[in-house]
Swiss-Prot record:
PANTHER family: FERREDOXIN-TYPE PROTEIN NAPH. The gene is mauN. InterPro entries: 4Fe4S_Fe-S-bd, 4Fe4S_Fe_S_CS, Electron_Trans/Redox, NapH_MauN. [4Fe-4S] cluster 2 binds at C237, C260, C263, C266. SUPFAM superfamilies: 4Fe-4S ferredoxins. Coiled coil: none annotated. GO terms for cellular component: plasma membrane. PROSITE patterns: 4FE4S_FER_1, 4FE4S_FER_2. The keyword Metal-binding applies. This is Methylamine utilization ferredoxin-type protein MauN. Keywords: 4Fe-4S, Electron transport, Iron, Iron-sulfur, Metal-binding, Repeat, Transport. [4Fe-4S] cluster 1 binds at C227, C230, C233, C270. GO terms for molecular function: 4 iron, 4 sulfur cluster binding; metal ion binding.
Amino acid sequence: MRLSLIAAARAEGVAAKGLLRAHKWWSLRRLTQIMALGVFMAGPLAGVWLVRGNFASSEILGVLPLSDPFIALQSLMTGAVPAGVALLGAALIVLFYLVVGGRAYCGWICPVNIVTDTAYWLREKLGITRDRKLDRRTRLWVLAGALLASFLSGAIAWEFVNPVSLLQRGLIFGLGVGWTVIAAVFLLDLLVTRRGWCGHLCPVGAFYGIVGKTSLVRVAAARREGCTNCGACFQICTEPHVITPALKGTGSTLILSGDCVNCGSCIDACPVNVFEMTMRGRSISPH
């Protein structure tokens, strides 16, 4: 029943907006993810070195350093102070996500999101209803565990099992242990629990959620008085608990939780255009 309701809600959105408009933010997001992965892959596979490095640490055109601040924090926990250029790269990333929202990384950049979205899509198509409940705070414990492991081992612990790094290496060097981890993430989301990895376990998402909690760019239920209670936004959202205060509350219409990935899926799904992307009140929705 639940899956048929999801399909009906999506069909209503497509009927109201048309196929392209009902997938506008999804299309932009997927294009951004593919482009991000593509620039990292272009060097090793085609000799086009726009970016050298990986999602953890890289350099754009040999000039602009970028470093994952979560990696930098783990490095500090090992007792090693990262090089100045690495700290600069981490600071640039933090500043960027303070503007666009920390977990925008999850929805717009992270290639593993493509894996988990595919698992969710297939889950619906196959009618899989099993949904083992996990506390979403578990990812905070995994985050703390990664930092503690780095402190105790003197190594950047999360990189040994980081699905993002393992996926990139697997695409370049072929099959290996990395694909086992990616398969485990896929099967978790497909067979065990809805949005299990991104929504409940990933420490990188937990970290960026903390970073971007006060970010400028937000989704808003700007026209919540027009809500028809179809439930499409809740069904499609990777973090549905973030919607309720903005949509059903009496205070701010902004979705203020750091868990929001600013993906725009609720904007796409809503047949009556309740939601919009805003920057402290100024609409930045694409046209």
